[in-house]
Amino acid sequence: MRKILFVFFMLPVLVFAQKESGDEVYLFSYFKGNGDGLHLAYSYDGFNWKALKNDSIILKPTVGNDKLMRDPCIIRGADGRFHMVWTVSWSEKGIGYASSPDLIHWSEQQYVPVMAQESAARNAWAPEINWDDQLQAYIIYWATTIPGRFPETDSLGDNNHRIYYVSTRDFKHFSDTKLLYEPGFNVIDATIKKVKKDKYIMFLKDETRKPVQKNLRVAFSDSLTGPYGKPGKPITGKYWAEGPTVLKIGDKWIVYFDKYTEHTMGAVTSTDLANWTDISDKVSFPEGTRHGTVFTVTKQEFDKLQQSAIVP
């Protein structure tokens, strides 16, 4: 980052780098309600988020029995295109996928049956996507409950999810589905970031209901596809949190999340990924924002997106 401004917050003091208008722009993909389509918000500082296009739907879902678009995750791929995956249903065994060169013109939507091989699988929730430099492939991962697969925790929640994944290079051919993470409890909403070479951090939700957890934790690995170590203590407070997504500004990591019982968004921050400070009162999002993903675009891409005529 070439130019920075410093914003100071007291009790405790937090210093963040704010990008000027000539640099990249932060975007946040999200859904509203039960998942009517893709919405986008933008920010220049990572704190104040405004709805793009008057909070209009950018893309409507067309795949899956329920035609939902929940938990939209967008990344810029190694090919320069934007790749998006999302939850299509509460109870189907597949996920949605589409790509775009500019967030305006989208490919035909695909239904990817990632858990079709498991006859008892209940769902495929909150998929995320990462590019793996080691495998030279995209890794797509999500949460699924398979009744009886982990009987020791079957009675501790409404479902009993674990994190699974597939890999692909072309979004036409996919690897066999494999288990990505088994932390010893009901887990959903995993998202992974590369910290440095050969070090990855997974943010995840402990979905345990008995006793109630409903918090976010982290686990580390030397590889994107694991194995990941034992999860740490909660990084969120005495509220229910889910749907983490992560942005690094300068040396500060910011984790945004859905405080879904309070119908608002929250955030925590850290410089060392070990000690976390709640800054929920420092961030603002469009009303009704739900679980999504933060990513960056160039100012030129953003200007083109703002000026476009969106036809969902």
Task: Annotate each language-model stretch with its function.
Residues 17-312:
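Carbohydrate-active catalytic/glycan-binding domains of CAZyme proteins
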Residues 1-21:
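Bacterial Sec-dependent N-terminal signal peptides
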